[in-house]
Every structure is written in C-alpha cells, then in structure tokens.
C-alpha cells in the first residue's frame, strides 16, 4: 500500500488528529514529518478520553501502530519526555515510537533566543509560540544544528554546543542583555534527557521504506497548515518548515512516487492563531458564536483563535499546491442553528474581483471577501452517520464547498468523537 499524506488546508487547527484517529485501525505506521511542539492536535476516543498531543504522532493512541518522529521534525527533548510520561501515566503503550537519528534537537539556547526576540520586536512580532522552533530550523539551514544522533557521541555534542554558544551567548548578552548559558551545563542536561530516549533512535527512512515494500500502510501526518508553510503560506506570518505535501517526502525520507493519496483537512469555517492577514475574519456576534461553539482555543498556546467564514480561495489554493485528492471536512455540527452561512468565493482587491490567492503580501492585506450565502439548518446533526441523514441545506453546503475547493469531500466530521464521522468515500480503498 502506498503512503498517504494528511495535510492541513488552512492555517492549522483543522482537526487533523481526528482524521488520523479515524484511519488509525487500518494503518501500520504514522509519521510526523515537520514542525515541533509549536502545534497541537486533540484526539477524543470513543470512551470520551481526550488527549492533546504536541510532538508525538496521534497514531500513538491506536494499538499496534508504529509511530515515527521523522527527520524533518525539530525535537525538544524535555517536551518529548513529558509527553511520553503523560501518555504512559494513562496506560498508553509508547514502545512503538521511533525517533529519526537525523531530526534536529531544540536546545535551551534556541528557546531563550526565540522568547527574547519576540519581546524585542514588540508590535512587529510574527507571533511565534516562543518554543525555539524557528531558531532551531535556522541552525539546521546554517549547518550548525544538533541532530538527535549527536547525543550518542558526547565529544561531538560538546563540540557543537561550544561552537554554537560562542556566538549565541554574544547575542544573548550584548544584544538582549540576558545571562550567558554554560556549554557544559547544556550538554549535561541534554545527555541526561537522552538516557530516556536513546533506545528509540533509528534510521527511520530505512524502516519506512521497508514497510512500504512489505505492503504496509504509512500515514504521513503534517502539523499546522498550508497557509503556514514557509514557502507557500502567508509569509512572513508562517512557520519555519513545510507542512505542505512536498515536505512530507523530504521530512520522512519516503520518495514522492510512493505517495498515492493526499488527504486535506478543511474546517467548515476558518480560524487562525497569531498575527497575519485573514480576509474572512469576523469581529461580531458570529465570530463569537464560532469561537464558542467550536471551542476555538489553541491546543499548544492556549490562545483564542481568530474565527471567520469558510474561504474557498484558500481551499482552492491548498488543493493546487498540495495536489489534494480528498478532503475531510470537520466541525460541520458547529454551524447548526445559523439561519444563513456565508462562503467567501472571491476577494475584492482595489476594486477588482480576484478568485485566486493574491501574489503579494500587500494585496492579501487589502483583500475584502466576496460572499455567497447558503441557507442554514437548525437540526442537531451530531448523530448523523450517512450523508443522506444530514439536513438538505447541510448537504447543499457540503456539495458547494466540494465544488469550490476542487477536490471531493470524502469524510465529514459532525462532532469531536471518533465515531462522529460520515464517510462518503473510503480514502484507503
């Protein structure tokens, strides 16, 4: 069975954990291929148990599934160990989790620099989570990063940390007026943490490709979303990695010809956390309604999410840049009880109608949504398990989103639970 990529098609927080959990029983492997603990996903099990994960793939909650933190991920050792301990305390078997030897480690100096930089920028800040993700990726690209495998060689680790702090301590002390970090203290801290995860380090590229050769099913799970991609997102208000489908091959070591399906996750309205343009953002009672009904609070940051109507311009763009074959539409139940449900079908920019993503940052900031209104529905749809059980207006809304997005909507979420899903097409079929 070829690999499947799971992509957030908006600004993240679309409900990717629910999709992974739904497919989990038919998967052998789940791979996280980019990002770090700057994003979170929530999974609600049939018994009502809720798990919030930030670094570990959500397949960890499905017995028998092997999970991989891939080479494209940046790993905070402390967060990894805390998350493992939290899962094990709730009797989750974590023995099947592997960690790529080539993933990069978030070091204490990355976190320190990230936090003080955001404070220094003031109202010009990008809105990072302050968890060291960006600085770690900077070191990776500059070829001065610390990789997971380095914890297996104390001499190499010490050399890398000493070289890094020779420069970074200058930045912390002379620019930000902060205390210098002691290289040996940093090394000792990381080596101490490594004692608890060294047995998980592996050549995950080899293991994943061998699994595909055996006919096993591999899900490549992205974090965040298309519009946060460092290349294809609303730059500079983006993350430091590639959540789009192209990043799945690079961040896992699986060749693109092994990928057969790209499953995009779309929320039936739009949300965003942090700074940056958001054409359909609502500042009225409807925005409050979506936030309250949808429980729109960031899993990782605890920050309230900005809410707006569905943006078909963004959805079309996500379909194109990811090669999305199928969509999983989430949170349709949140829209119940609205008399009318607007859909942004295009933008007005400087008096012109624009149906594709604007080319420049300035144009996107000036974009005003052009809405098409659909009739709403009052019924509680949380018990629907077939498309035909949905109210006629809800069915019409889904079909219109499918038409505007340019890919079929194969699954529909009608509640947070694993079983609260309508499957129109089998994405693993």
Curated annotation (Swiss-Prot):
Chain residues that bind GTP: 12-18, 40-42, 305, 331-333, 413-415
Intracellular or extracellular location(s): Cytoplasm
Known cofactor(s): Mg(2+)
Domain of life of the source: Bacteria
Catalytic activity entry: IMP + L-aspartate + GTP = N(6)-(1,2-dicarboxyethyl)-AMP + GDP + phosphate + 2 H(+)
SUPFAM superfamilies for the chain: P-loop containing nucleoside triphosphate hydrolases (SSF52540)
Coiled coil: none
Enzyme class label: ligase
Residues annotated for IMP binding in this entry: 13-16, 38-41, 129, 143, 224, 239, 303
InterPro entries referenced in this protein's UniProt entry, alphabetically: Adenylosuccin_syn_GTP-bd (IPR018220), Adenylosuccin_syn_Lys_AS (IPR033128), Adenylosuccinate_synth_dom1 (IPR042109), Adenylosuccinate_synth_dom2 (IPR042110), Adenylosuccinate_synth_dom3 (IPR042111), Adenylosuccinate_synthetase (IPR001114), P-loop_NTPase (IPR027417)
Binding site for Mg(2+): 13, 40
Keywords: Cytoplasm, GTP-binding, Ligase, Magnesium, Metal-binding, Nucleotide-binding, Purine biosynthesis
EC number annotated for this UniProt entry: 6.3.4.4
GO cellular component: cytoplasm
Residues of the active site: 13, 41
Gene Ontology annotations of biological process type: 'de novo' AMP biosynthetic process; IMP metabolic process
Pfam families named among the record's database cross-references: Adenylsucc_synt
Subunit architecture: Homodimer.
Protein name: Adenylosuccinate synthetase
Organism of origin: Nocardia farcinica (strain IFM 10152)
